[in-house]
Amino acid sequence: MLNYVLKRLLGLIPTLLIVAVLVFLFVHLLPGDPARLIAGPEADAQVIALVRQQLGLDQPLHVQFWRYITHVLQGDFGTSMVSRRPVSEEIASRFLPTLWLTITSMIWAVLFGMAIGIAAAVWRNRWPDRLGMTLAVTGISFPAFALGMLLMQIFSVDLGWLPTVGADSWQHYILPSLTLGAAVASVMARFTRSSFVDVLSEDYMRTARAKGVSETWVVLKHGLRNAMIPVVTMMGLQFGFLLGGSIVVEKVFNWPGLGRLLVDSVDMRDYPVIQAEVLLFSLEFILINLVVDVLYAAINPAIRYK
C-alpha cells in the first residue's frame, strides 16, 4: 500500500506540469488585455505600455512561461495583477470559507442522499422508491443559480429567517450549503439505490436472511459495506466537484471563497491568480482520488494495491 501511495504521489509531478502548461496557454489566449483593464479606460497607449512592462507582459511568451514555472517550483505563485498582493495570500484568505462550505454541503448531501437511496432500494418499486427518485431527478434538473435565488427569495426576503450574503456566522452557511449540496444529494441517492439494488440480490444476502438474521441487520452489516465501494468513488468525485465547482453558488450568495475569486480574476484577466487556482483545483482532485483508493482497502480488506 505504501509503495502504491508513493507511486501515485510521484505521478503528481508530470500531471501538474501538463496542467500548468495548458492553463498558461489558456489564460494567455483569453480575449482582452489585462494591462488595459488595470490601467483603466482613460489610459493612453503610453500608460498601457508601461503597465505591460511592469507586469512582464511585454516579454516573449516562452520567457513568461519559463519565469512562471521556475517561480512555481520555488513555491512562488507570483503577485496578483489587480490587488498587488501575493497570490498565495489571496488564495489563503479565500480557502477556508470554500472548504467549510464544501464540507457542510458534503455532509448533509451524503447522509441525506444515502438514506434516500437505501430506502428506495429496500422498498423498490413502492412509494418510498418513487418519492425518493422523484426528489433526486428534481435536484439534478434544477439549476444551482435558480435554486439559490429561490431559497434566498423565500427564506431571506419573504420570511426573513436567514441572511442573504456573507460568511460571518453559521446561519450564512445554510442557504449556500443547501444550494451547493442539492445536486450531490440527488446523485448520491440514485447511485446508492443502484448499488444497493445489485447487492440485495446477491447470494450472501439471501443466505443471511435464511439464517434468520433480521432485515435491518442484513442491510446494514452485509449490504452496506459491499454497496459502499462504488458509492465511495462517487463521494470522492462529488467532493472534488464541490470544492472546485462552487463558482456559481459563491457568486449568487456573494461568498468570499475561491470560486468568486476565480470569476473576478477571469473578468480582470488576473493571470497569476487564475493559474494558481486551476493548479490548486487539479491537485485537490488528484489527492481526493488517492484518498478514495486508500479507503477502498479500509472498507473491503479483500482489496489490496501493489
Swiss-Prot record:
It comes from Salmonella paratyphi A (strain ATCC 9150 / SARB42). Residues 95-292 form the ABC transmembrane type-1 domain. The keyword Nucleotide-binding does not apply. Residues 30-102, 156-168, 250-278 are periplasmic. Belongs to the binding-protein-dependent transport system permease family. PROSITE patterns: ABC_TM1. Gene3D superfamilies: MetI-like. It is a multi-pass membrane protein. GO terms for cellular component: plasma membrane. One of its GO terms (biological process) is transmembrane transport. The complex is composed of two ATP-binding proteins (GsiA), two transmembrane proteins (GsiC and GsiD) and a solute-binding protein (GsiB). The chain crosses the membrane at residues 9-29, 103-123, 135-155, 169-189, 229-249, 279-299. It is found in: Cell inner membrane. Signal peptide: none annotated. Keywords: Cell inner membrane, Cell membrane, Membrane, Transmembrane, Transmembrane helix, Transport. Residues 1-8, 124-134, 190-228, 300-306 are cytoplasmic. Part of the ABC transporter complex GsiABCD involved in glutathione import. Probably responsible for the translocation of the substrate across the membrane. This is Glutathione transport system permease protein GsiC. It comes from the Bacteria. InterPro entries: BPD_transp_1_N, MetI-like, MetI-like_sf.
